[in-house]
Amino acid sequence: MKLKISSIFLLVAVVALSAFKNPTKPVTYTVDASKSTITWVGKKVTGSHNGTITLKSGTLNVNGKNVTGGGFIIDMTSIKDADGSAKLEGHLKADDFFGAEKFPTSNFVITKVAGSGANVTVTGNLTIKGITKPLTFPATVAVNADGTITATAAKIVVDRTKYDIKYGSKSFFESIGDKAIYDEFELAVKLVAKK
């Protein structure tokens, strides 16, 4: 009888202890800037412009196969126009837009990742020109055969007026007519990260 009670007690103790097993700690992956990309699209009444911005650095916190946090830094001095317009690039770097001399970097810090597996919703804080605002967007996450993680957000919509970028905005200059530049611009971000 004592043996039976001892066996039951031991079985209950093992089950109880396994329920309180320490959760695994997230692993920090370093974003490989040379394999990662950021593209942008800005639209106006009469057309659009697009180009690239260089990623300076970043990290992704990964627990199992799930991204749980991280962030990245963007080099605002690297803004390029796909058409190679030096005039446009200079204007985007000027104080009318991103003020790259005074604010050479922007950054995004992940505060929450909803969902698990390949399709997630990312929430975080985007800082542009020293102004930080919350931002949420859909993303996909893939664990690659070589052990790297690829996190992709195909369309991040940013309202530039929230970051005191008002140049050409019809929201502030109603009489601007067909010279208006839309308040929202889009980013597409692909981060490739490794342990």
Where are these regions (language model features)?
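Low-complexity, acidic/polar, glycine-enriched regions of mature
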Residues: 19-195
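Bacterial Sec-dependent N-terminal signal peptides
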Residues: 1-27
